[in-house]
Amino acid sequence: MVHINVLKKFMCVLVVILIALTVCLWKETRGSYYVPLKNDGTQVHRALDKWNLLKSQGLLHEAAGEMGQMPKALPNNQNKVKGITSGAVEKSRKAAEHVKVWDKDSSSRNLIPRLQKVRKNYLSMNKYNVTYNGKMNAAKLSPEQLLCRLRDRVNVTMIRGSDGPFNSSEWQHYLPDKSLNETVGRLGRCAVVSSAGSLKSSHLGPEIDSHDAVLRFNGAPVKGFQEDVGQKTTIRLVNSQLVTVEEQQFLKDALYNTGILIVWDPAPYHAEIHEWYRKPDYKFFEAYKSYRIRHPEQPFYILNPKMQWQLWDILQENSLEHIQPNPPSSGMLGIVIMMTLCDEVDVYEFLPSKRQTDICHYYQKFHDHACTMGAYHPLLFEKNLVKHLNQGTDEDIYTHGKVTLPGFRNVHC
């Protein structure tokens, strides 16, 4: 009987201890959840929930320093905007300290396992016979030095009637008479508009249309999306796959009838034009001719394939690891084309904003993480380079997905 009473007392004490521990744990959990939501940055914390998940993978970094200073790219006087109260300025300052943007030192370790495997497969496949023997980030270049490399080594030209197999009488009827520079003239501020899903609900349309010229990609529409992407199209860069695939309706869709067209096709690594001409990645030449017959007044250029590998070499030599041995993305090609034509280039949603999403295109519902991080193209390394060159602020990237780059004519080496 005595043993039973002792056992009962022991059980009661044990239950009390368990209850006390449960209460303590509940308070601790409750506190850790609610405390961040009590400060002035409530909206910032909520908006950044999914970005914090990416941060744990090392893809994103805090723009502000560990001590909470304003980042150098965002001086305090930028908050002194007419009509904003001092309280609003303080909230804006605190929000800026939590801005999280693309980390220019991102690496393949940041890729999800599936994309890491895809990258390794492309490295071993080496479809374009890449034999790069140059340096790999031996000494990290300053943005100014890198701009000089791009200006001096990437030759942005279009196929001309004097180029190898295109100098026949047959081709003279199809290639434009004027060069691209002659056609567009001197351009001031230009916009490069990606097709990213994060453009949805951005309300960037009026800002995009305020530029002197706008470049868009492939089949990205403006009709129905003007509020977010604008309606002006000066140049449309399309890949050769789109031109040759029947379901894209390239020859029939009125979408392509506006502005200047440029088509590009992947070529073997540093191949001569005649070698690429004999065996293009996609047999788009007949479709090109058909389009020119239907629309003889619309300028339609073929990008010289040498450019893609000149640009790829610079991407590789400024990366610490081997990048995919495939041509740069249309996005990266378009950025460099506009840097050649314009005094200043604003690039929208090439680096993801606070609206970052795995939806690939603003006009479709297809989801894939590769659209942000890259699979076939060395997109991750392209974004590292663009972030390094950015002359705008991290706040511009976070809020608008906007990167500002100088035109090459304003680069002084």
From Swiss-Prot:
N-glycosylated. It is found in: Golgi apparatus, Golgi stack membrane; Secreted. It catalyses: a beta-D-galactoside + CMP-N-acetyl-beta-neuraminate = an N-acetyl-alpha-neuraminyl-(2->6)-beta-D-galactosyl derivative + CMP + H(+). Residues 1-9 are cytoplasmic. Substrate binds at residues 195, 218, 239, 329-331, 360, 372, 376-377, 383. Its EC number is 2.4.3.1. Its main location: Golgi. Residues 27-413 are lumenal. It is a single-pass type II membrane protein. Disulfide bonds join 148-413, 190-342, 360-371. Belongs to the glycosyltransferase 29 family. This is Beta-galactoside alpha-2,6-sialyltransferase 1. It comes from Gallus gallus (Chicken).
